Amino acid sequence: MALFEREDDKLRPDPHSQALSVIAIENDFVEGVYHKIAKVYDVMFGPILHPGRLLALERMGIAAGDRVLEVGVGTGINAALYPRDCQVTGIDFSPSMLQKARSRVSRKGLSHVRLMEMDAADLKFPDESFDIVYAPYLVNCVSDPLKVVREMRRVCKPNGKIVIVNHFRSANPVLSRLDRAVSPLTVHIGFKSDLDLPGFLAQTGLRPISIEKVSVPLWHLVICRRD
C-alpha cells in the first residue's frame, strides 16, 4: 500500500463505485440539475419522499444532546422534524438548495440547526464527531457513493448510527432490468436508478442492523451501527 496518494488519484472515482451502476455521474452535472430544480424540489419530490423521511427520523432514536449530521440536506425539508434538544448540522454542495434551506431554518426559528456548504465526499469535520450520520436520498446522486459513505463512517462516533434512505435496484429480475434501462434517463433529474444494494453494502463494509422498504418498494431505509 502506498504511503502517499497522488492528487489526481484522490480525484479519480473509486472503480468499485463505478461498477455499482451502469451510469457515471459528475458532481458538476448534479449541481447544475439541483440549481435548476431547487425552487420546485419540495413540490416535485416532497410528498412521495416524505414517508421515508418520517420513518428514518423515527428509527434513528435521537436522544437529547445527540449530534446529528445530515449529508445532503437539500432544501432543509427535514429540518423541522428534528427534536429541538439535539444539535443538527446539515451539509450540501448546492448553493441554490442551501439558500432554500437557510430561508426555511430562519423562518421557522430552528436555532438547533446549522447549515454548511460542503462536498459529501470531503467532509470538513474531525473523526468521530457525530452520534448519527444520515444521508436521505443521496447516495445515488453522487459520483462516488463509496467515498461518501467512507466519509460518513469516519465522522460517526463508535457505536453511532449511519442511516441511509435511498433508491436501490430491484431484486426482481424484470424490475432490475427496467432500473438499468431507465438509469440513463433518471440521471437527467439528478440520480441513478440502478444502484445495487448488496454490492453497495459489500463494497462499503457497512453491516446493517435493519433494512426496511419505504414509500414504494424500490426505496430502502438502511440503518447501520458504526463499529
Kindly give the residue locations of the regions a language model identified:
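C-terminal lobe and adjacent flexible extensions of AdoMet/dcAdoMet transferase-like proteins
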Residues: 222-227
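C-terminal alpha-helical "lid/dimerization" subdomain adjacent to the S-adenosyl-L-methionine
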Residues: 21, 25-28, 45-47, 163-221
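Short glycine-dipeptide loop
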Residues: 65, 156-162
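A short acidic, Gly/Pro-enriched loop at the edge of an enzyme's catalytic core
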Residues: 121-133
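Class I SAM-dependent methyltransferase SAM/SAH-binding core
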Residues: 67-122
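A short SAM/SAH-binding and catalytic strip from SAM-dependent methyltransferases
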Residues: 132-144
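Conserved class I S-adenosyl-L-methionine
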Residues: 4-63, 77-78, 100, 108, ...
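A short glycine-rich, Lys/Arg-flanked "PGG" loop and its adjoining helix->strand segment in the class I
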Residues: 146-158
